Amino acid sequence: MSFVEDLSFGREGEVIVRNLLESSGNFDYVIDCSNDKYFQEKDIDLLALATDGHIAKYEVKTDRMAHETGNIAFEIRTSGNIGCLAKTEADFVMYYIEGNGKLYCFNAEQMRRYLRANRFKIYRMGDNAEGYILSINRLLRDKQMKRIRV
């Protein structure tokens, strides 16, 4: 898949999450900042102003394999750069799975602590990347993420 196709694919999850946040009633407005260089460097796709005045930062990942494998990959390095989970300054990561339309949410800092504390095996992955591969069921069972109804 080309870079442009990857961007288009990732956009699908961003649109779904933005629509979900906007319709939730919890936010006054949601800003798509995925094309802004400043926020790209921080791996933040959406800013949501909560009705209480708090600003929540979201990173959105769209996955095309998890519906077949039942796993989520957390890249810690990709092509010599720091991977998304290690890099993101988002409060939450929304993980959209194409193929079954499921959406999961986890607190980025809490997930980093969980991965470090459990010393999971680090795998070599495609695109010169390495990271953790964990079962969605395990993450749900361990209360590290939750499923969001779309």
Label each PLM-derived region with a short phrase.
Residues 1-13, 17:
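Extreme N-terminal tail/first-helix region
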Residues 4, 18-49:
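A short acidic/basic microdomain associated with nuclease active sites
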Residues 21, 83-85, 112:
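Residue-level recognition of single "structural anchor" positions
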Residues 4-7, 28-33, 61-103, 108:
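Catalytic cores of nucleic-acid endonucleases
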Residues 21, 46-48, 52-66:
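Conserved catalytic cores of phosphodiester-cleaving nucleases, focusing on short active-site segments
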Residues 23-27, 54, 142:
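A broad structural signal for short, well-ordered beta-strand segments within beta-sheet-rich domains
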Residues 3-5, 19, 49-52, 70, ...:
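Non-catalytic C-terminal interaction segments of nucleic acid-processing enzymes
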Residues 41-43, 53-57, 69, 87-90:
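Short connector loops at helix/strand junctions that flank enzyme active sites
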